[in-house]
Amino acid sequence: MYLDINWEEDSIPENERGSLTGLLEQGIAKAVHLSAESEEAEVSLTLVDDARIHELNRDYRGVDRPTDVLSFALQEERSDEPDILDYEDHLLGDIIISVERARAQAIDYGHSFERELVYLAVHGTLHLLGYDHMEEADKEKMRRQEEAVMSQIGLLR
């Protein structure tokens, strides 16, 4: 598992980044292992502010507002592929997380910032692996995977 983290948003102090990196690596690696049954994956994670994620959301999704997480898969699902992708090429893609959204949501949901940040990284990873939440059945399947990952790494609600 290789995770490249880009700290574009500077509100997280340098001395906290090491422990956050470890938690993010655990969450993403566990999501890949449980969902793709693989230990090999390469993911790029960029932590940004609301202004930057708003810009990306507008430019790439046509949604003119900030969001918490965006995922950009390097390989898109084709109609002849299964619902959950199984890559021979382990380059999964990019995840962008708004640190501001993560902080606000942690307060709203009554848990730690660390838990929310890792949850968003897991959520983004599952999108890279082909999960979606547009239909209720798919949403339930994705939520079960998210909760399984968060439970296994000890970051429960």
Curated annotation (Swiss-Prot):
A biological process (GO) of this protein is:
rRNA processing
State the compartments where it is located: Cytoplasm
Give the enzyme's EC designation: 3.1.-.-
Per the annotation, how and in what number is the cofactor bound? Answer: Binds 1 zinc ion.
Family, similarity comment: Belongs to the endoribonuclease YbeY family.
What are the entry keywords?
Cytoplasm, Endonuclease, Hydrolase, Metal-binding, Nuclease, Ribosome biogenesis, rRNA processing, Zinc
NCBIfam families on file: rRNA maturation RNase YbeY
Question: What is the recorded name of this protein?
Answer: Endoribonuclease YbeY
